Swiss-Prot record:
One of its GO terms (molecular function) is cyclin binding. The gene is nap1l1-b. One of its GO terms (cellular component) is chromatin. A motif (Nuclear localization signal) lies at residues 274-280. This is Nucleosome assembly protein 1-like 1-B. PANTHER family: TESTIS-SPECIFIC Y-ENCODED PROTEIN. Residues 1-38, 347-393 are annotated as: Disordered. The lineage of its organism: Eukaryota, Metazoa, Chordata, Craniata, Vertebrata. SUPFAM superfamilies: NAP-like. InterPro entries: NAP-like_sf, NAP_family.
Length: 393
């Protein structure tokens, strides 16, 4: 009986020891995890480690997944067939955009009479009739106008005494100042010049010619330069790159050329003169040296960096051209067709509304994903990640 009791006690002691060992192992594991987290945090603060990690990630971009590499040879052949079909689709898409360009050229001619009349009104070459000036407003706006009518009576009397301004003064300057993309380019010393800007037009290449478009800036005679017309031409391409056909995503701007501005003496705002004092090391005499250096100005827009024959640009030139292409496209697609709405600010409000809606949709989607994660007991964060999408971003 004593042996049995001793045996049971021994088994109980062993179980207790196992429990103690398990607790000790768990405590040791937690300490190890804590140390690992601390070590990871220290490593991620090391610039050399981060640089090496970024280089490794860059190397992974565009590399095939392990699944693709593991496919049987016969399946890989079929995938290659699909890729060949994709190239043919890209070629058809290129033709589609070429025809879109032809449609733009055709309809540009239909828009032109309205744009010409717009220019005539802005520059006081034509006074619109009462019928042309009528504009139907919403009921709320109508009520607000009625309430303001009495307050405006005195101002109107004063306005009658003043000389009637011609056309719509500073129309294009106001448009530029209302649009962030353009206002960032306009310096204070540019504004007196842009007050003389009469019109901006877009001209498309003729049928059968390589795809391009020209922006025309028409100026009235002024004291700054002799040109009445400044131009910027953008060369486009709508065909897949043979070396990377899958990157095709519609027409792209390949380059641009500006024009020479004939500045009048002392009026070139793209240059500035600085004075620097120099002291002679031996004699100790001081002299003042003047030097001409580039100056920030909207009119640098007409002197873009030249793209070398090999197509390689330094980082600064590439950044300038990228911004230049964006501005040229924005002027062509948004500003010129809808300039009056940018003048009044209505188009800017519409753009802001579009961004707000996109932001709300994105927030909703994120909320739904988070809810799914919280309520799904089988949710695996690792499986939820999509490496391919991360690479594309």
């Amino acid at each position: 009986m004593a042996n049995i009791d001793n045996k049971e006690q021994t088994e109980l002691d062993q179980q207790d020891m196992e429990d103690v060992e398990d607790v000790e192992e768990e405590e040791t594991g937690e300490e190890a995890n804590s140390k690992a987290r601390q070590l990871t945090a220290q490593m991620m603060q090391n610039p050399q480690v981060l640089a090496a990690l970024q280089e490794r990630l860059d190397d992974l971009v565009g590399t095939p997944t392990g699944y693709i590499e593991s496919l049987p040879k016969v399946v890989k052949r079929r995938v290659n067939a699909l890729k060949n079909l994709q190239v043919k689709c890209a070629q058809i898409e290129a033709k589609f955009y070429e025809e879109v360009h032809e449609l733009e050229r055709k309809y540009a001619a239909l828009y032109q009479p309205f744009f010409e009349k717009r220019s005539d009104i802005i520059n006081a070459s034509y006074e619109p009739t009462e019928e042309e000036c009528e504009w139907k407003v919403d009921e709320e706006e109508d009520i607000a106008e009625d309430l303001k009518e009495k307050a405006k009576l005195e101002e109107e009397k004063k306005d009658e005494e003043k000389e009637d301004p011609k056309g719509i003064p500073e129309f294009w300057l106001t448009v530029f100042k209302n649009v962030d993309l353009l206002s960032d380019m306009v310096q204070e010393h540019d504004e007196p010049i842009l007050k003389h800007l009469k019109d901006i037009k877009v001209k498309f290449s003729e049928a059968g010619q390589p795809m391009n478009f020209m922006l025309e800036f028409h100026f009235e005679p002024n004291e700054f330069f002799t040109n009445e017309l400044l131009t910027k031409t953008y060369k486009m391409r709508s065909e897949p790159d043979e070396s990377d056909p899958f990157s095709f995503d519609g027409p792209e701007i390949m380059g641009c050329t500006g024009c020479l501005i004939d500045w009048k003496k002392g009026k070139n705002v793209t240059l500035k003169t600085i004075k620097k004092k120099q002291k002679h090391k031996g004699r100790g005499t001081v002299r003042t040296v003047t030097k001409t250096v580039p100056n920030d100005s909207f009119f640098n827009f007409f002197s873009p960096p030249e793209v070398p024959e090999n197509g390689e640009l330094d980082d600064d030139a590439e950044a300038i051209l990228t911004a230049d292409f964006e501005i040229g496209h924005f002027l062509r697609e948004r500003i010129i067709p809808r300039s009056v709405l940018y003048f009044t600010g209505e188009a800017i409000e519409d753009d802001d509304d579009d961004y707000d809606e996109e932001g709300e949709e994105a927030d909703d989607e994120e909320g739904e994903e988070e809810a799914d994660e919280d309520h799904d007991p089988d949710f695996d964060p690792k499986k939820a990640q999509n490496p391919a999408e991360c690479k594309q971003q």
